[in-house]
C-alpha cells in the first residue's frame, strides 16, 4: 500500500496490452455503406430546409411588383414572382435534362445493337 494514488493496484501497467490486440492501433470499424435510401433521406432533408428558407423569403417579400409580358400587365407579390421564375427555370432544366437522357439512351441502344451483330 502506497500513498501515491496514481499507482493503485486497480490500474493496469502502462506497458501492458490487451491479449489479441495490436499495440498502438485502434480497432478498425467497417466502412459505412452509401445506399439509395440514405441518399433519398438526405435529399428530402435538404429539400425541406430549402423549402423553409423559401417560405421565409416569400413571407418577407410581400411588396407588390408590376409585371408586363407581351402586352399583358399584372401585379404579384415579389416573393411569389421570384418563386414562379425559379419553378419555370427548374422546369426548363428538367425538360433539357430529359431530352439529353433520351438522346443518350437512344445512342446506347444503337451501340448495344451493333455490338451484338
Swiss-Prot record:
<keyword id="KW-0812">Transmembrane</keyword>
<protein>
    <recommendedName>
        <fullName>Uncharacterized membrane protein Rv3760</fullName>
    </recommendedName>
</protein>
<keyword id="KW-0472">Membrane</keyword>
<dbReference type="InterPro" id="IPR010445">
    <property type="entry name" value="LapA_dom"/>
</dbReference>
<dbReference type="Pfam" id="PF06305">
    <property type="entry name" value="LapA_dom"/>
</dbReference>
<feature type="transmembrane region" description="Helical">
    <location>
        <begin position="38"/>
        <end position="58"/>
    </location>
</feature>
<dbReference type="GO" id="GO:0005886">
    <property type="term" value="C:plasma membrane"/>
</dbReference>
<feature type="transmembrane region" description="Helical">
    <location>
        <begin position="76"/>
        <end position="96"/>
    </location>
</feature>
<feature type="region of interest" description="Disordered">
    <location>
        <begin position="1"/>
        <end position="28"/>
    </location>
</feature>
<feature type="compositionally biased region" description="Polar residues">
    <location>
        <begin position="1"/>
        <end position="19"/>
    </location>
</feature>
<keyword id="KW-1003">Cell membrane</keyword>
<keyword id="KW-1133">Transmembrane helix</keyword>
Amino acid at each position: 500500500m502506497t500513498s501515491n494514488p496514481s499507482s493503485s493496484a486497480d490500474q493496469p501497467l502502462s506497458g501492458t496490452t490487451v491479449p489479441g490486440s495490436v499495440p498502438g492501433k485502434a480497432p478498425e470499424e467497417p466502412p459505412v455503406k452509401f445506399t439509395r435510401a440514405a441518399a433519398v433521406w438526405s435529399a428530402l432533408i435538404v429539400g425541406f430546409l430549402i423549402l423553409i428558407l423559401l417560405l421565409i423569403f416569400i413571407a418577407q417579400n410581400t411588396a407588390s411588383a408590376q409585371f408586363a409580358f407581351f402586352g399583358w400587365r399584372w401585379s404579384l407579390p415579389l416573393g411569389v414572382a421570384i418563386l414562379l421564375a425559379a419553378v419555370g427555370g427548374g422546369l426548363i432544366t428538367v425538360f433539357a435534362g430529359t431530352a439529353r437522357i433520351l438522346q443518350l439512351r437512344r445512342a446506347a441502344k444503337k451501340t448495344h445493337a451493333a455490338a451484338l451483330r
